[in-house]
């Protein structure tokens, strides 16, 4: 069972403004509302029975985690939800799409992360989603897509890594960003380092490096989509480890706190962009084949995620 650091919990209490405000719900939800909740597979229990990468990630289930989100936007903290969905799937490296047809075309296994954030800014909602695709063998990530939608409009960006370069596509409602297609240097994507962390934290880039920062952060802070110089550090502190990335040019810092032991479950994340801080603290984590649970009667499963 993981434990958040004292520093992290203190920060969340201060952000919420009251020591009585709960910062984290238990990973094992009660089944009082619906007896079927007792049958939901908790990620921590699943990890005990599947202690290696192959058995954990190739069991036909997705790991779904909910984080209590405090998103800074327009200079104010906004409460919301962040959902991380990790799942393996076959991927066509040339077309860079999921391999769905029963043919003999060669594919690669990827660990996909769908990361969403939802929060309100006054009357209107924000919805962020990033999908990243990283081969399970540790070779460079292949693709990242990101969308930011709110009532003013939407923005979409996509990066494809092919033949030693990165193809970039940007579509936006906003004139200053416009519609662009361009190429950039072949560097790692911050948005796909989460999968590397889950596979082998020791393989994460450290020291001086160059990265494409998280695309949602570039969009929210109106920064150019391109590689930036970064400084990265990996620290192990007993049961918990931390991975920190700093971009001096952007005044951006990302800190990911995760369990040192496999499957290196993410405990929390904290982003600081030009003095504004966003935090997410994990509250629930389950294993589920969610794609088969799309009936109205399956909505009870949302309670297993604290939703």
PLM regions and their residue ranges:
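Bacterial signal peptide processing site
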Residues: 17-20
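Surface-exposed beta-loop interaction hotspot
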Residues: 159-206
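Acidic, serine/threonine-rich low-complexity disordered tracts
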Residues: 22-167, 202-307
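Bacterial N-terminal signal peptides that target proteins for export
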Residues: 1-6
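Hydrophobic helical h-region of N-terminal Sec-dependent signal peptides
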Residues: 9-10
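C-terminal motif of bacterial Sec signal peptides marking the signal peptidase cleavage site
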Residues: 13-15
